[in-house]
Curated annotation (Swiss-Prot):
This is UPF0757 protein YmgG. Induction: By heat shock (shift from 30 to 45 degrees Celsius) (at protein level). It comes from the Bacteria. Belongs to the UPF0757 family. It comes from Escherichia coli (strain K12). The gene is ymgG.
Amino acid sequence: MKKKILAFGLISALFCSTPAMADMNRTTKGALLGAGVGLLTGNGVNGVLKGAAVGAGVGAVTEKGRDGKNARKGAKVGAAVGAVTGVLTGNGLEGAIKGAVIGGTGGAILGKMK
């Protein structure tokens, strides 16, 4: 419990500090917010990493301008590939949904970097 409180405090301090906030883009803010949510779910480091990845993907998709457009294109392709991969692994609908989320997140982040 003490580790969770300490980690949440550190994430909050980084997220809320004024100089850091001024220079962050939506992808970074999403990653920090997702990491905080992942921490609060109680899944430890695994939850923090998954939350940060999904938060970064959502942040990348909501970016304005060319970066956001590229991220949205990447998310579409990544989600489609992930869903097909999830079905082909034999996990049915659940695998397709998980694959689409993971693929869409990765595609959005990579698309933004394009």
